[in-house]
Amino acid sequence: AVGVAEGMRAADTALIVVSGKDGVCVGTEKAVEAATKAGLTKVFFVNGLCDESARFYRVFESLKATFGPSVCPVVVPYIVDGQANTYVNLFDYKAYEYGTDGSVKQTALPDMGDRLEGLREAIKEAVAETSEELLDKFIMGEEFTPEEIILGVSQGVKDGTICPVFCGDAHNTFAIDQLLNSLTWLAPSAADKSGEIGVDLDGEPVDVSVNDGGAAAGIGFKTVSG
């Protein structure tokens, strides 16, 4: 737990990996607590879905039950005969099929029945938490526009009111591209954070802000003395 907290001190976003087999555990809750305390954006990644014993949808419901309506699905698996080779992006409504040889191709959107609509509803529920205006619209049963959903999720992730959920398999790199591509516009950049307070050579406090033209600066953590 101490190591997690130290790492978050130097991070802009906390990527919290959850086992697709074991689900939410004490470590998950401690990681969320540490990220919240550090004021970081929180992103969940449900991993290990190539394991036939993995149960993504059970884990997703556990995340919602534990952390509330802020948990928002972004990428979900389409599972056939225990195999999760196809992943659906709920934002662009596109499906991608992955191979163990590293190949990936767009494929037809699978028929997921009522489950897909339920997941879209979870997104709307999360977006409704981001502003009074959107909450009123949600309560009145009005549909969000695509722009409202994208902007709502983006802003909600940055201010911490939405925790997006991605999934895949790190070992086979399934859906890792969707996670990384989405983080480029979902997660806050260093420029979105407030500056750090450092000390100059005389030991006096100095504000260190993000500046492309400024001197190089970094945060040291988990160092070993001696």
PLM ranges: what are they?
Residues 1-226:
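Structural and coupling elements of P-loop NTPases
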